[in-house]
Every structure is written in C-alpha cells, then in structure tokens.
Design a protein with these regions (language model features):
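Alpha-helical bundle regulatory/interaction domains
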Residues: 94-187
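N-terminal low-complexity or simple alpha-helical regulatory segments
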Residues: 1-127, 163, 174
Length: 187
C-alpha cells in the first residue's frame, strides 16, 4: 500500500497536551471532541490511534472558540520533560545530538503515520526538518506544534544548545507568528 493511500493516524499521546490545556482554560472539551467525531471520554491509552485530521479539527475548534491563535505553542509548552518519557529513551546509547535526531527520524512514524522527519546537512551544519505535507495547510496550529516539538526534542538531548536557528515554510496561516519568533518561544 502506498503511503498516500493510508488514512492519516496519530497517537492519542500527541493529542493529550491539547486536551489538557483546553480543559485547564475551561473549554467544553468533551463536546468539541464529539463534534469532530473523536471519543469524548478521556483517552487513557496513549498508544491509541486516532484519525489525525479529526484531531487537528478539534484543535482548530478550540482556537476558534477560545480566540487563542497560538494554542499549538501553548500546548507544546505544556508538555514538560517528565511527560516526554517515551522520547527520553531516545537518548540512551546515543553519543551526540545527531544520533538522537537520527533515531527520532526513524521512530516518529510510530506516533503519526504522516510524519517524515529528515536530517540534511553539510560537514558543519545539520538541518532537522519535517518534510511531510501538512494535512491542513491553513491550520497554523499544526506548524506551530511541530516546530516547538522539534525544538523541545533538541533541548531534551542537549539542555540548551549554544545556537539553534528556527524556521518554517511561510504560509498565510503562520506568517502572523513569524515577525518575532522569540516572542512565542519564551517559556
């Protein structure tokens, strides 16, 4: 089966930070989950596969209802390092950040079958990129969550690197955040 023939699926663990933050701010989470045809009960099984498009529709519904345009960043920031226990195991046996990133590129499709993380570079620089086409180009939350998640992975492995450049493909949905990326990266 070609990858383009597969239904895009994502683990419940990826949606959970969005649910937690939405719940904290008083969003009617269960109602919004039902409205996009996702299970309305708490997703106890982090490995449960969910339709990815429905998950992003849920997140978009929270953004529209609560008027929080950077909700994807807030949710990604809500994921603390202890919550990244599954990712922390990536660092075992790796001698450097490059090894961690290589391993992540291999295991990322276990969390979403729409992921295509790659490493490109020269002898002096490495670019860590998400090459898969976003399911919904006009949903900024997808881009914001992915970029901050990638930053957090680097921080998990290195603490705070001496330098890190951040960028993404400019689309109308995310250009509003590009003027000052430091303003949304601050924790």
């Amino acid at each position: 089966m070609k990858s383009s023939d597969r239904a895009p699926l994502i683990r419940a663990a990826v949606l959970e930070p969005f649910i937690q933050v939405a719940d904290r701010i008083g969003t009617p989470v269960e109602r919004l989950l039902r409205s996009v045809r996702l299970p309305s009960e708490r997703l106890e099984d982090a490995a449960l596969l969910l339709p990815e498009t429905a998950c992003w529709h849920f997140i978009h519904s929270v953004v529209a209802k609560e008027g929080i345009p950077n909700f994807g960043l807030i949710a990604a920031n809500a994921v603390t390092f202890p919550d990244l226990a599954e990712l922390a195991s990536l660092t075992h046996g790796c001698s450097n950040l490059l090894d961690v990133l290589k391993r992540f590129c291999v295991v990322a499709p276990l969390f979403t079958n729409n992921a295509l993380f790659v490493l490109e570079g020269t002898a002096d620089h490495v670019w860590f990129s998400q090459k898969a086409k976003p399911l919904l180009d006009d949903y900024a939350q997808i881009h914001l969550f992915q970029v901050l998640g990638m930053i957090q992975l680097v921080q998990l492995a290195t603490g705070s690197p001496a330098s890190m450049a951040v960028g993404w493909n400019h689309t109308d949905a995310v250009n509003v955040f590009w003027a000052n990326p430091a303003s949304w990266m601050a924790t």
